[in-house]
Amino acid sequence: MELTGLTRAAAAATVTPPAPRRGWGELRFAPLLPGERHGRRKVVVAAISEEVPRLAASPSSGIKGGGAGERRPAPEKVALRAALTVRRKQKEDIKEAVAGHLDALWDMVGRNVVLELISTKIHPRTKKPMQSGRVSIKDWCQKRGAKGDHVVYTAEFTVDADFGEPGAIAVANRHNREFFLESIVVEGGGLPCGPVHFACNSWVQSTRELPTKRVFFSNKPYLPSETPPGLRELREKELKDLRGDGTGVRKLSDRIYDYATYNDLGNPDKGKEFIRPILGGEKIPYPRRCRTGRPPTDTNMLAESRVEKPHPIYVPRDEAFEELKQGAFSSGRLRAVLHTLIPSLIASISAETHNFQGFHHIDNLYKEGLRLKLGLQEHLFQKIPLVQKIQESSEGMLRYDTPSILSKDKFAWLRDDEFARQAVAGINPVNIERLQVFPPVSKLDPAIYGPPESSITETHIAGHLNGLTVQQAMDEAKLFIVDYHDAYLPFLDRINAIDGRKAYATRTIFFLTEAGTLKPIAIELSLPPAKPGEPRPSKVLTPPYDATSNWLWMLAKAHVSSNDAGVHQLVNHWLRTHATMEPFILAAHRHMSAMHPIFKLLHPHMRYTLEINALARQSLINADGVIESCFTPGPVSGEISAAYYRNHWRFDLEGLPSDLIRRGVAVEDATQPHGVRLLIEDYPYANDGLLLWSAIRSWVESYVQLYYPDAGTVQCDLELQGWYHESIHVGHGDLRHAPWWPPLSTPVDLASILTTLVWLASAQHAALNFGQYPLGGYVPNRPPLIRRLLPDLERDAAEYAAFLADPHRFFLNAMPGVLEATKFMAVVDTLSTHSPDEEYLGEGRDEGGVPWTADEAAVAAHGMFAADVRRAEETIERRNADHGRKNRCGAGVLPYELLAPSSPPGVTCRGVPNSISI
C-alpha cells in the first residue's frame, strides 16, 4: 500500500523493515578517519512529489507522546520515497517488445528491480555503513503500456531516524534485459538535507549478465579525503570495478576501461595489402586506445582480430551512443551507403570513363543527383532490384546538398584571395606560421633527403612584396607560410608508387596585404631525391602571367589543398583531438570517482568520444577504410599521423594561446584582453577562438578554486594525481619521458591542464570538424586525393602536349574520380552533422532533470560561464557583419561561424558541442 495514502493512525504505527534476502550480500566500509570533513557548501535541492510522512514510534516502545505543551520525542523510523526515471527506447523491434512484456510478467512474480539506500554515516555500534532494507520498485508491470519516452517508478524505504543523508543507492536488476536509468530522487520528511539527487544516466544490466549490484552516488561532490565514512570503501570498489584486471575479451555489456595499442587497423589474415604497422610502442609512438581484448589474428599474434561492420565494436556500455545519437548516425550512415553504392554499381556496369567530364558534372551532384548526371540507361538501372528499391524509397537521398562554399559565390574557390583566406578561416586554420627564416629550411636528415634549404629564392617573390625586401617583410611580420614539406617528403616514394595517386611535399608562402588579407606569392612542389643525399627535384611556381601558367598555378594550388586535406584529417583532426584525448578519458574513468568534482567538470566533455573513436578504427582509419581510399596518402596515412605525434605533438602547446605563439602568429602582450596580440589581425579562427578560450579558462579557474584552495590539496588528491600520472605514463606512455609535460602541483597547474582539455574537446574539435562538408564538399576546392603530378615537358612530352591541348580535362582528370569523390562527400557530410541530442558549450549541464552537482557555488560559476559564451556568440555575429573584416565579410565571402557556440541539428557549419562526438 502507498505510504502517502496512510491514515494518521497508521502513520503512527511501527514499521518493520523487510528482512534481508539471501544473496544480497553485505557492504563493509572503513570507519571515519580523525579530522576528516564531510562537505563545505550549500546544496541544490528540488522536491519531486507530495510530502512523505515521518513514521513515529509505537506506544509499545515506551516513548510517551503527548498533549499540548509536551515535548515530542524523535521518531524511531522515517519513511523515504524514491522516484526513478527510466528512459525507454523510442523504437522497439518485435524481439525487444516481447522481452519487455516478459520482464513485466517476471516483475509480478518477484523477479524485479531491487534498491537499497546507503547512508553517508557508519553505524556507531557495527562500524559498518548504515543501510536501508531492500525494497522493490513499484508499478513496473502496470506501467508497461504507459506512453512516453520516460517512465517514473517509485519505491518506498523505511529507515532509522538517525539514518542521515543517503549518499549512494544500490540497484539490482533482476529482469532479463538491461534498462537505461536516467535519475533517482530520494525525499522524505526525515531528510535534514532535503531531496537527494542521483544523476545516473547509465545502463543497468540484468543480474544474469552482471551478478553484482550497480551503485550510484548522489550529485554531491567530494574530494577523496572528504568522502563520508559510509561511502569510502564503496568509492574505491567502484573504481576497481571500472579498471578491471586487464584480461579477457570484453563483452558489450561490460563497463571496463583499459588501454591497448592501435594494433587493429590492419587485417593481415585478409592479405599482405591489408597489413598495417602497429601504432603505439617504441618503434612507432602513438596514444593508446580503449582495450577490447579480442584474440589475435591467425597470421600475426601481435595484431588484434577485427570486428567488421555491421557488428559493434566494444566500448564501455555507457560510452555507446544513446538512441537519438545512434539514430542520427545510422541515418547518416545510410546516406553514406546510398551515396557510395550508386557510383560503385555504375562503375561495375558502365563502360564509360568515370572521370568528371566537366565542372557541370560536379554541379549535377547537387542538382540532378547521381543517377541522372551519369546518364545511365533507365532499363539497365531497373535491372538492379536494390537500386530500384532505393529509387522508390529514398529518392531524395540520391542528391547531395549544395556545400556552403558554393552558396554565395560559385567561382570563389578559383581566386587566390579565397585560397589564402581559407588558411585563416577555413576548415584547417591551424597550420599557417609566420615565416622567420628565409629560405625555409627542412628538419629532415640531409644525408637522406638532401640539402635542407628550400628552392624558393628572393628572386621568386621580390616582385610581390610591395617594394619590401624579404628581410624587411619578415621584420614587419608580412610573410607567412603553410609548410607540409617535412610531413610528406619521407612518404612520397610509397604514395606515388600507388596507381592513381600522386603527391608533392608542398610549401606555400603568403604575403599580408595592407587590407589585412593574405595572398599566395610562391608554391614549392618537391619530390624525394633519386638517391639519398642528392638535391630534391623541386618546382617553384609564382602567380600566373598567361594561360599556361594560370592552369599550372591552379594545379599547384590543388596539390597544396590536397596536402592540407591530408594533414587536416590525419593530424589536426584525428590525432590532435580524437586520439590524444582518449587516454585522458580512459584514465578519468579509471581513477576519478563519479563524485569527484573534477570528474563532474570533465564528464560532459568526454561524451561519446570513445564510441566515435571505435567507429573510426572500424571504418575510417582502418586498412582500406574511408581515409585510406579517399585521401592521397592511402596506406601510409597512419604513419603520417604517428610521425607528427613523435616529432611535434606537445601537450603543453595544445592550448590556443600557446599554439598561436608557437606558430609565430601571435606574441605575448599583457595589455591585450586575452594576453596575446595577433600578427594577422583579421584571423577569424584565432579571434573567435580566443573568446571561447578565455571563457573556458575563467570557468575552469573559478571551479578549481572551489575545491583546491592551495597546492597541498592538489598534491594530496590521490585520485587526481593517479588520473594525470596514468594519462601520461600509460595513455601517452611512449612520450612519458618528455620534459615538456606540465606539472600538477598547484591549483594554477590544474586549471591550465583542464582548460586545455576542455578546449580540445569542444572548440578546437568543432573548428576542425563541422565545416568539412560545407567547405570541402565541393571537391575542386579541397581535393582529398590527386591523381596526377604537374605536366612536365622533360619527364613526359606526350602528357605535356595533352595538357596544352585540353587543360580543362587534364585538371579534372587530376581530381578524384566520381567514385572517390562521392564516397568522400558522403562521409564528410555525415561527419559534419549535428545530432538532435547535441549538448553545446555553455548550455545547461543538468542530467535527466537532475542537477549535475549539489554545489550551489559550482552552479553559479557555470551560470557565469554560460553568460560568457552567449556574449562570445553575440561578438561573433557582430564580427561577421563588420565590412572591415574582409576574411569573414564581403561580396561572396562566407561568414566564419565554426566557433559560434549554438546550432540547430544537421549540417550547419557552426556550433560547438561539449565533446568530440563525431
Swiss-Prot record:
Q: Where is the PLAT domain?
A: 90-218
Entry keyword Membrane? no
GO MF annotation, one: metal ion binding
Lipid metabolism as UniProt keyword: yes
**Cofactor note (record):** Binds 1 Fe cation per subunit. Iron is tightly bound.
Stretches the record annotates as Disordered: 56-76
Record-linked Gene3D superfamilies: 3.10.450.60, Lipoxygenase-1, Domain 2, Lipoxygenase-1, Domain 3, Lipoxygenase-1, Domain 5, PLAT/LH2 domain
Which InterPro entries did the record assign?
LipOase (IPR000907), LipOase_C (IPR013819), LipOase_C_sf (IPR036226), LipOase_CS (IPR020834), LipOase_Fe_BS (IPR020833), LipOase_plant (IPR001246), Lipoxy_PLAT/LH2 (IPR042057), Lipoxygenase_dom_3 (IPR027433)
> What cofactor does its activity depend on?
Fe cation
Task: List, in alphabetical order, the GO biological process terms annotated in this UniProt record.
Answer: fatty acid biosynthetic process; lipid oxidation; oxylipin biosynthetic process
A Pfam family reported for this protein in Swiss-Prot or TrEMBL: PLAT
- Pathway in which this enzyme or protein is active: Lipid metabolism; oxylipin biosynthesis
Reading the lineage from the top rank, the first entry is Eukaryota
Q: Which reaction does it catalyse?
A: (9Z,12Z)-octadecadienoate + O2 = (13S)-hydroperoxy-(9Z,11E)-octadecadienoate; (9Z,12Z,15Z)-octadecatrienoate + O2 = (13S)-hydroperoxy-(9Z,11E,15Z)-octadecatrienoate
Keyword annotations for this protein, in alphabetical order, are:
Dioxygenase, Fatty acid biosynthesis, Fatty acid metabolism, Iron, Lipid biosynthesis, Lipid metabolism, Metal-binding, Oxidoreductase, Oxylipin biosynthesis
**Enzyme Commission numbers on file:** 1.13.11.12
Listed binding positions for Fe cation are H573, H578, H765, N769, I918
Domain annotation Lipoxygenase: ranges: 221-918
Describe the family membership recorded for this protein in Swiss-Prot or TrEMBL.
Answer: Belongs to the lipoxygenase family.
| Role, per record | Plant lipoxygenase may be involved in a number of diverse aspects of plant physiology including growth and development, pest resistance, and senescence or responses to wounding. Catalyzes the hydroperoxidation of lipids containing a cis,cis-1,4-pentadiene structure.
UniProt protein name = Probable lipoxygenase 6
The uppermost taxa in this organism's lineage are: Eukaryota, Viridiplantae, Streptophyta, Embryophyta, Tracheophyta
